[in-house]
Amino acid sequence: MSAPQFTPYLNALTESMKLCMEDPSTIFIGQQIVYYGNPMSKTIEGLPKERMIETPVMEETQMGMSIGLAMAGHRVVSFYPRWDFLICAANQLINHLDKLEAMSDGEFVPNVIIRVGKGSDKPLDPGHQHKADYSDEFGSMLKHIPIIKLDSAEKILPAYKKALISKGPIILVEYPEMYYES
């Protein structure tokens, strides 16, 4: 059996991560990013580990750390491999990250890019969990955080360029089944 081939989708994500790292204030944070364990970690291979923070399975703490790092002047790329994990951080996301600029009277505009994956049913169907897309549900609760669905390779680099020049948080939704050719 041969190794899976990279697709234009995965290549665009990898290039976007390199682009993010051009800013010396960028920090990556998440589960299984320093130590390979999910498909997203494939997109950051070879990038400086000293600018990555490996977290345990503590999604709400990860979001809180992302907010704190952003308040300290960092651009944060926070990795959530699936929406089901981001749900666990909903309190920090909805009640803090979304409202921080307003709560601080504009003093803090947190530059947080949230990478979240829509779970796949390939090669195995995980059942009811880990494959839903909650973009619409979160979109109805978030008033100041745009959600962009990266449903084609052509959308990825422009979305990351927009995120890097914009002030404030953004959620970029990935489709991991598009990482590899079948």
Which residue ranges define each predicted feature?
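Thiamine diphosphate
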Residues: 1-182
